[in-house]
From Swiss-Prot:
Residues 2-56 form the ClpX-type ZB domain. InterPro entries: AAA+_ATPase, ATP-dep_Clp_protease_ClpX, ATPase_AAA_core, Clp_ATPase_C, Clp_protease_ATP-bd_su_ClpX, ClpX_bact, P-loop_NTPase, Znf_CppX_C4. It comes from the Bacteria. Component of the ClpX-ClpP complex. Forms a hexameric ring that, in the presence of ATP, binds to fourteen ClpP subunits assembled into a disk-like structure with a central cavity, resembling the structure of eukaryotic proteasomes. Keywords: ATP-binding, Chaperone, Metal-binding, Nucleotide-binding, Zinc. One of its GO terms (cellular component) is HslUV protease complex. HAMAP family: ClpX. It comes from Shigella boydii serotype 4 (strain Sb227). This is ATP-dependent Clp protease ATP-binding subunit ClpX. Belongs to the ClpX chaperone family. GO terms for molecular function: ATP binding; ATP hydrolysis activity; ATP-dependent protein folding chaperone; protein dimerization activity; unfolded protein binding; zinc ion binding.
Length: 424
């Protein structure tokens, strides 16, 4: 760099890249015979960030897991529901394959495959959606359909769902457009009859109408902060056609609708198939036979059902499945409490009889896997309260009587350190 002197008394330093003097910039960083200013450093960072953004999609394309890999990952965290896992694995794989290869393939437009999960409370609907998002490393948000209303009414706008998704990825629109949205309690926004409503139904059919475009694909204008309260803010444009929507609900009573259709279709008179009570299909078997007409009778509008072409049904969890859930998944409940006790230096053992008792209680409460934590928490509350103040506890043992509230956990004490030292 050519030296430039000022008044012949000292050097005036210049940035080797943009030519600005040390007085025109905030900072000038010196290297071997060269200088760079803070403005040029910022510019270099911007260039590198743009390069990374361009490279990222190519990395993602090669990293898309196959349906088998998705299913295997779900097996690590979700017990049972084999058919639902297979349906989800294929639907999710096809959705992200569509995103990474464009919406068309050889001139054929690829449709959007949103998913409807039907199953009782605590059967694993939410966990399946969360696990998928974690595997694919995409933003994930949950919404409760019962809190949603049409725009202009008291309650949450459907656009707030997209705002929550943006919050999860620091308002990065590109990331949000690859995200997963799970809308729970979707059965609660069914209309009261399968005939069009005469009066305004702002939290039922009205919400279904409001969700239609969002789920199918539209460019939603979402303010970065707040919904209706800050209309003056600059809106973010989010293309929802690239977002995977998974809707879930218990659909209590849907089995009766299906049963009526199946029995009506089996014939009447001399040609009718006579079934004994023992031949009646279980709720899970009936739900597996669900058709769009059943969902319409239940109260979903035809247009809304059309936006959810992939339907997966989940069975009510058996007692054996609940015991597996307690001990087998990577983040099993017993493993979580054992990790908590390990932080206090205490080993925690759950005997098989205790696991049986927990599962029986959950079955009696009809809460599925969701009720397991509250049962274990209640049984261990006093111990977790006292343990940090206790010394020399080495192990805790949980048996059936602890779960039934008849006794406290058996605590096994070790020798105090002073005694151990003197005994040696």
């Amino acid at each position: 760099m050519t030296d430039k002197r000022k008044d012949g008394s000292g050097k005036l330093l210049y940035c080797s890249f943009c030519g600005k003097s040390q007085h025109e910039v905030r900072k000038l960083i010196a290297g071997p015979s060269v200088y760079i200013c803070d403005e040029c450093v910022d510019l270099c960072n911007d260039i590198i960030r743009e390069e990374i953004k361009e490279v990222a999609p190519h990395r993602e394309r090669s990293a898309l897991p196959t349906p088998h890999e998705i299913r295997n990952h779900l097996d690590d965290y979700v017990i049972g529901q084999e058919q639902a896992k297979k349906v989800l694995a294929v639907a999710v794989y096809n959705h992200y394959k569509r995103l990474r290869n464009g919406d068309t393939s050889n001139g054929v437009e690829l449709g959007k495959s949103n998913i409807l999960l039907i199953g009782p409370t605590g059967s694993g609907k939410t966990l399946l959606a969360e696990t998928l998002a974690r595997l694919l490393d995409v933003p994930f948000t949950m919404a409760d359909a019962t809190t949603l209303t049409e725009a202009g009414y008291v309650g949450e706008d459907v656009e707030n769902i997209i705002q929550k998704l943006l919050q999860k990825c620091d308002y990065d629109v590109q990331k949000a457009q690859r995200g997963i949205v799970y809308i729970d309690e979707i059965d609660k926004i069914s209309r009261k009859s399968d005939n069009p409503s005469i009066t305004r139904d702002v939290s039922g059919e009205g919400v279904q109408q409001a969700l239609l475009k969002l789920i199918e694909g539209t460019v939603a204008a979402v303010p970065p902060q707040g919904g209706r309260k800050h209309p003056q803010q600059e809106f973010l444009q989010v293309d929802t056609s690239k977002i995977l929507f998974i809707c879930g609900g218990a659909f209590a009573g849907l089995d009766k609708v299906i049963s009526h259709r199946v029995e009506t279709g089996s014939g009447i008179g001399f040609g009718a198939t006579v079934k004994a009570k023992s031949d009646k299909a279980s709720e899970g078997e009936l739900l597996a036979q669900v058709e769009p007409e059943d969902l319409i009778k239940f109260g979903l509008i035809p247009e809304f059902i059309g936006r959810l072409p992939v339907v997966a049904t989940l069975n009510e969890l058996s007692e054996e499945a609940l015991i597996q859930i307690l001990k087998e998944p990577k983040n099993a409940l017993t493993k979580q409490y054992q990790a908590l006790f390990n932080l206090e230096g205490v080993d925690l053992e759950f005997r098989d009889e205790a696991l049986d008792a927990i599962a029986k209680k959950a079955m009696a409460r009809k809460t599925g896997a969701r009720g397991l934590r509250s049962i274990v928490e209640a049984a261990l509350l006093d111990t977790m309260y006292d343990l940090p103040s206790m010394e020399d506890v080495e192990k805790g043992v949980i048996d059936e009587s602890v779960i039934d509230g008849q006794s406290k956990p058996l605590l096994i004490y070790g020798k105090p350190e002073a005694q151990q030292a003197s005994g040696e």
